[in-house]
Amino acid sequence: MEEIRVNRLPAITWRYLHVNDSPDQFEFPGSSASAVFSDKRYVSEGGTLPADFCGASAETLAAAEKGQAYTVIIPENTEAELTISITAEEDRPDFAGCFIFKLEKDAKLNLIWRLSGDRRHSAFATASFYELMENAALSVSYLETGLPASSLYEQRYAVLGNEAKLDFVSAELGGEKVIVHSYGRLAGSWSEMRETALYAAAGRQSLDLFYHIDHIGKESNAVIDVKGALSDTAKKIFRGTLDFKRGCSGSVGDEGDYAIQLSPETKNISLPLLLCTEDDVSGNHASSAGQLDMNTIYFLMTRGFSLEDARLIVVEALIRPLIDRLDESVREEVLAEVRRKLDTKEK
């Protein structure tokens, strides 16, 4: 095990704030579980990540690259659906691997990720590269559940061509230490990328979330939307960046991070960042964190709800629009897991 630094800000601030990056006790994953594909028609083994894939750190990226590599190519004018399941097992508790996705012109893919397992002290390190050619469309639903006392390193990089669209929705509900590093490059004009994440962190869970989208093509559009709840002694840090590069005139970007702290022992840090070298653009950022409004809780309790039920209603009202963006096949599972994790009557 070694100490590394992960998720470094693209434009650093004062060192005494201790938010430019995060320290992490990192251990390379061991015996690897298998990735199971629901459909192997477009899947082949092997592949190489691009040289400019950074990842959360050099160490975490190297760990993913030491595992198995897979390449998924969706041909031109093809619509496909694919589910990738990775389950920690007793004899193979860890996972390391790389995934390269290429959607050719006018291709469409509905992709579902499932990471799960009851095995304690697992370590997952993944690196995924998504390349979307002209007018390609990719919808991703990413679900993590279970994996108690485990470390999860999710790293991804997306490059979008003209009029390409990427909608990435993740439910960060598993693991004890979750590190997400997502970088998007809107290289094509009229390209669109939406990064949505919901979470329900409980116990000693720690979330380190990094999202960065570069606007390069003209009239590109980006959204970063993160919402969730923290209970017990959970903590979360959000680093979100929208970078408007010279030449991306007419582009629009919005980012927001919203956290409900159900306990005074929780900790939340939010760093929404806007960078710009182009005049004709629109960029907005926002963050909100705090405990529940007791007037709202009182109102719900006067209508017959218990304190626990009232708290869950407020949290669900915040994250339900994000859940509805997930693939329909996983929505009820996500909602049930959120309720289970935040139900204080079970603790």
Model-predicted segments: where are they?
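Long, low-complexity, mixed-charge
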Residues: 1-70, 89
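Residue-level detector of solvent-exposed, low-hydrophobicity positions
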Residues: 21-23, 33, 44, 49, ...
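Conserved beta-strand/loop scaffold segments within soluble protein domains that form the structured core
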Residues: 55-298, 302-305, 327-347
